[in-house]
Amino acid sequence: MENSMNNRGHGHNQEHADNLPESKRQKLPALASVIVEAVKVDSLQRLCSSLEPLFRRIVSEEVERAISRLENSKSTSRSTEPNKIQGLDGRNLQLRFRTRMPPHLFTGGKVEGEQGSAIHVVLIDANTGNVIQTGEESMTKLNIVVLDGDFNDEDDKDWTREHFESFEVKEREGKRPILTGDRHVIIKEGVGTLGKLTFTDNSSWIRSRKFRLGVKPATGFHIREAKTEPFAVKDHRGELYKKHYPPVLHDEVWRLDKIAKDGALHKKLLKSNIVTVEDFLQILMKDPQKLRSLLGSGMSNRMWDNTVEHAKTCVLGGKLYAYYTDQTHQTAVVFNHIYEFQGLIANGHFLSSESLNHDQKISADTLVKTAYENWHKVVEYGGKLLNCLPVAKKGIKSLPEPKMAQNHQTQQKALQCQQTVNGYSSDPQHLIEYPFVQQPCYQLRDYTSMESSSVSGSYNGGLEDIFTEEIRARSSEMLETDNMQRLLKTFGISGGFGNRDESIYGFSDQYEAQIDKGYMREGGRGAGKAVVGWLKLKAALRWGIFIRKKAAERRPQIVEID
């Protein structure tokens, strides 16, 4: 009977379930969703189990660090040591590093400062900033230690010795001491230099991944310790791939920042025949857009800026290149070792790129573009120093016209002549070497004639248009000054400077007679005559430089550029 009642009840329940609407029936989960849910739970459990040791270690380190700092602060408050470390006479003594550290060092290599410099430490009085050169403290022995890169207290902030030592890094278990070599330094007269030191372990195993060097007194003097900037120490195997700061021109291009050796960017550059830093800089100056397009999207704009900035710190050589705009080689565009525009040479004058005015810059831009397009015509500059050429400040208004080529040829032939003035040759090569005699030979020939107050008629006739009233007035003012009159009177220089009208220069017959008498009185002394000769030559050269400058200013310099 009981079974029949159960069967009847079960049938009733089944009938009731069949009568329920579809939305109210209990849905069973699909097999796929069950599997996905199980995989998610398993993955989450694995992730938690892998992260748990990491979290425990970080929390443990931070708790230990906080406890140690709390204990140090308590001991400091209880101690009688003052906030500022005082010397025997009340001075605030501090150690300071005078050398900056490079961003990277390598194990097994010598510990050096930036660009291979020695590392210096000094003892100063923080109240005055002066180096302590006297007293017992100025001959202190110091211990060199390795600090954690997290020691970020400012140099002007006071800390205790215990606080400083809490950041010292000890070697790992089973490893050699982190720093080997001369771990002590003795300062003499307040200055000391670190000896040979070597790191035996890298800095990747500590949280900051960087070390600092620190120094502290080995004796009982109250001197505050010093620390360097943080730096990374890498395994010596990475030294083969390290970057150079600054790079040199013959370095391979992967020595630049953001370009990895044998990486995608390096391969692109090699494919375009850009092998060295010099090649990189030259194409950067000639066509930066082409270089940027070559590197493509694999180098972001920020990476590009870093690479270019690093490349431009390269130390350049003294090689110069010139693109001559005419056959007479009187006008040229000058480039440096990496094809960067430096300035213009026009009519024997050098105009640096910074000194060009607006119109000259427009003309120069056109010439630079032409030079880059015809780079096969660019030649190495002939070894003459640009700083030996006269610098045109305002006399040259633009580049000379090509129509003036014939005049340049005539002037060049005049420059090729050889004259000797008191034993000094006037060859153009010598004129480049000595800027104060950068005059053409026909002018030097005129200088020698000043002693006898005679000038050839062809010279005066050829330059009649140059010696204008402005130059005559200016020369008269120069010669009429008290200093010039006294100089001429003292050394007996004749008043005829290439013009038969003596009144132009303010000389009178009476004054000439005085000069002649003074000169005759000193004529018997050989040394006096030698001095007079040199002073006459010096005055003549100065006069010629003034005349040539005025002549250059008066010469037309108009040019039309398409």
Swiss-Prot record:
GO annotations of cellular component type: nucleus
Keywords recorded for this protein, A-Z: Activator, Calmodulin-binding, DNA-binding, Nucleus, Transcription, Transcription regulation
Region (Disordered): 1-22
InterPro entries, sorted: Calmod_bind_C, Calmod_bind_M, Calmodulin_bind_N, CBP60
Cellular localization per UniProt: Nucleus
Region annotated DNA-binding, chain positions: 154-273
GO molecular function: calmodulin binding; DNA binding
Region feature (Calmodulin-binding): 5-84
One Pfam match: Calmod_bind_C
Compositionally biased spans, kind Basic and acidic residues: 12-22
Keyword Cell inner membrane attached: no
Family the entry assigns: Belongs to the plant ACBP60 protein family.
Complex and partners: Interacts with calmodulin (CaM).
Function: Transcription activator that binds DNA in a sequence-specific manner, likely 5'-GAAATTTTGG-3', to promote the expression of target genes.
Listed name of the protein: Calmodulin-binding protein 60 F
Organism: Arabidopsis thaliana
